Amino acid sequence: MSKQILVLPGDGIGPEIMAEAVKVLELANDRFQLGFELAEDVIGGAAIDKHGVPLADQTLQRARQADAVLLGAVGGPKWDRIERDIRPERGLLKIRSQLGLFANLRPAILYPQLAAASSLKPEVVAGLDILIVRELTGGIYFGQPREQRVLENGERQAYDTLPYSESEIRRIARVGFDMARVRNNRLCSVDKANVLASSQLWREVVEEVAKDYPDVELSHMYVDNAAMQLVRAPKQFDVMVTDNMFGDILSDEASMLTGSIGMLPSASLDANNKGMYEPCHGSAPDIAGQGIANPLATILSVSMMLRYSFSQATAADAIEQAVSKVLDQGLRTGDIWSEGCRKVGTREMGDAVVAALKNL
């Protein structure tokens, strides 16, 4: 029986990078006889233009029926002035919450070929391999009430709410421990337990879950210190688990240790490892349509999809090897280019990965 993959290119550079990822996926599908069927739909700004909402009901239903979702990027200045609740990003938040995609896995891996592209000294980041496990469907991005109001004195005031339940913390903590167990048995839980009530509960529950993982070394770190330590000595970390907002910020910070956010994939999983896969970067409207965006994060998201949702480790490994081979050849998009390398565009980079995959 065939497996269904829903492709959502999205906005900005999304359609450009997705085109290259789909080429790689179709080759892997054929070569490894994976039995995938691909369908395409719209999300974000593209959905607003077509349906008047950032995620149409029929698109959400197709996503529910699919075995995995492959996403490009959403958003852009074209839609910045519309009502907040129907902006493109709301489509992304909705599909995450409606599909129950509570666990976001964001690897930060420095390819040895890109050591010079990192913002830190090579000796600080050489061999870097961090996995950030981010809670994705709770916390301040979804908490109610949230409001902007006018006080009696005429001054505007806005507030948000940061709620976490014990069950939400427990399930993401287990993902963190499980990931640590298949890596190097080290987990750092990041919170702000010295200030926030939600973080105090977070730390208590993580400690309780740790009793089921005696082989995993657990440490705790306040988020401000974690942000500093990621720059000072990033290789002290292996797996980090944290809440929605902290994970959003720390994973972007970690991305720059690797040279470019254009290299980093991500997976968002439900309790059964059904997932949505997307690059960590945004829609980059400033370079959209120019054919210069880096498609490698999206291509590597395909690899994560094969690994986590379909248990196709051989095909996933092959795609990662193809990307590494292309970097060995000195091909670089502008975001990772350095002296002595050949600068290429989006399509040429995608074609190079396809060629490398064919020759493995």
Swiss-Prot record:
Keywords: Amino-acid biosynthesis, Branched-chain amino acid biosynthesis, Cytoplasm, Leucine biosynthesis, Magnesium, Manganese, Metal-binding, NAD, Oxidoreductase. It is found in: Cytoplasm. GO terms for cellular component: cytosol. NAD(+) binds at residues 76-89, 282-294. Belongs to the isocitrate and isopropylmalate dehydrogenases family. LeuB type 1 subfamily. It catalyses: (2R,3S)-3-isopropylmalate + NAD(+) = 4-methyl-2-oxopentanoate + CO2 + NADH. Binds 1 Mg(2+) or Mn(2+) ion per subunit. It is an enzyme of class 1 (oxidoreductase). Its EC number is 1.1.1.85. The record marks Y141, K192 as: Important for catalysis. Its cofactor is Mg(2+); Mn(2+). Substrate binds at R96, R106, R134, D224. The keyword Amino-acid biosynthesis applies. It comes from Pseudomonas aeruginosa (strain ATCC 15692 / DSM 22644 / CIP 104116 / JCM 14847 / LMG 12228 / 1C / PRS 101 / PAO1). Pathway: Amino-acid biosynthesis; L-leucine biosynthesis; L-leucine from 3-methyl-2-oxobutanoate: step 3/4. It comes from the Bacteria. Mg(2+) binds at D224, D248, D252. One of its GO terms (biological process) is L-leucine biosynthetic process. This is 3-isopropylmalate dehydrogenase. Catalyzes the oxidation of 3-carboxy-2-hydroxy-4-methylpentanoate (3-isopropylmalate) to 3-carboxy-4-methyl-2-oxopentanoate. The product decarboxylates to 4-methyl-2 oxopentanoate. Gene3D superfamilies: Isopropylmalate Dehydrogenase (3.40.718.10). Homodimer. SMART domains: Iso_dh. Its main location: cytoplasm. GO terms for molecular function: 3-isopropylmalate dehydrogenase activity; magnesium ion binding; NAD binding. It holds the Pfam family Iso_dh.
